[in-house]
Amino acid sequence: MKIIQSFWSGNNDCLKDGYGWLSPIYHYASWILSCNQLRKYYDDVILVTDRAGYDVLIDNLHLPYTNVIVCLDELSKYSSNLWALAKIKAYNALDEPFIHVDGDVFAWDKFDGCLGEHDLIVQNIETTTDYYRMMWNEIRPSINVLPEAMEDYDQNVSHKAYNMGIFGGNDILFIKDYCKQALEFVDLNLEQVNKLQGINFNIFFEQVLLHELATRNDKDVATYIKEDIGDNEYQGFADFDNVPEDRKYLHLLGFYKKIPTVCNKMLAYVIKYYPEYIMRLEKLLSLAPIITELGQDTTHNKMRTEMLSYKESVLKGELETSSKDRNIMFRDIVSKLLSCMKEKSQSEVLMMNLLPKRELIMS
């Protein structure tokens, strides 16, 4: 099974924009973790990106993708707020069964077994509550051309969507038709929707539209997570304390990206398991080293304030922990790692030499 991921710079400064995260360091730590975890379980993991994304994720961070397709520069006419267009382009890029995985999804096991012979696979089905309905009511005046498939949702008859933290399937013809209709939905209303600020139109031309089309066409849709979850009720999807024993799948969607504790637990995990990538990230963002000897003074800038606060709390024993001993031990291990990672510099060079060669496809 081919796995794909997509990153679009959105005409923004890749080194300064947090892309929904508290800061760039967390954003790229997420990519480090997501890609490397996927490579543990899959031999073919493809990145779809633009030239700026290639420069950061491949040339600088050396993420271990097996192939890279550079085609998202063609999205330059769109507002960066329409970030799901990059996913739509990625879905349309392959002509064989695939699963797309968001860059804020982390897996500790394979998940393609759920697809089987089903037409499609998604993370889970959502019930759209007043949260989505209020957003749609704000967006609706900007929509001059409404796809026929969206009429039931528009009239408040349908109240479902798909969460597409993962999405793909075997029915490539349907997926390509869905991508065509999603792009048309945006393009036929582009002048208005390009101006939308602070309203998430992506939910509707990606998640709601897919559900409506799949329902109309009677598609057999597999769900990785079997629960029907309310659109603003995602609980436990950032539980780093319980991976990999009790949780095999995390998705730091939406609000999770703005919670310092969640971001810092993710960063601590990356420091522990992928230190060579953190060293590259420090260099890329011109940060003072995160991985230092205990007690050594470090300089820091605004971008690193939350991370350093977490590290200092751990080292001083001031951080509140759960009652589970292994959580305390995990943080203790991370703290101790800070004292020895300088020794990793030579192994980092070795790792870079061992990185697999990639096929670069430019379009």
Language model features: what each stretch is:
Residues 1-75, 256-262, 274-285, 289-295, ...:
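N-terminal anchoring/stem segment of glycosyltransferases
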Residues 26-28, 32-34, 73-101, 105-108:
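A conserved donor-nucleotide-binding helix/loop in the catalytic core
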Residues 109-139:
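Conserved donor-nucleotide/metal-binding helix-loop-beta segment in metal-dependent transferases, i.e.
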Residues 282-285, 304-312, 316-319, 330-338, ...:
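Residue-level detector of alpha-helical secondary structure
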Residues 144-157:
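Short, flexible, basic/aromatic active-site loop/helix in glycosyltransferases
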Residues 154-249:
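Catalytic core and acceptor-binding pocket of nucleotide-sugar-dependent glycosyltransferases
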Residues 223-303:
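Long, compositionally biased intrinsically disordered regions
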Residues 9-12, 52-55, 74-75, 105-107, ...:
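Short, solvent-exposed loop/turn segments at secondary-structure junctions
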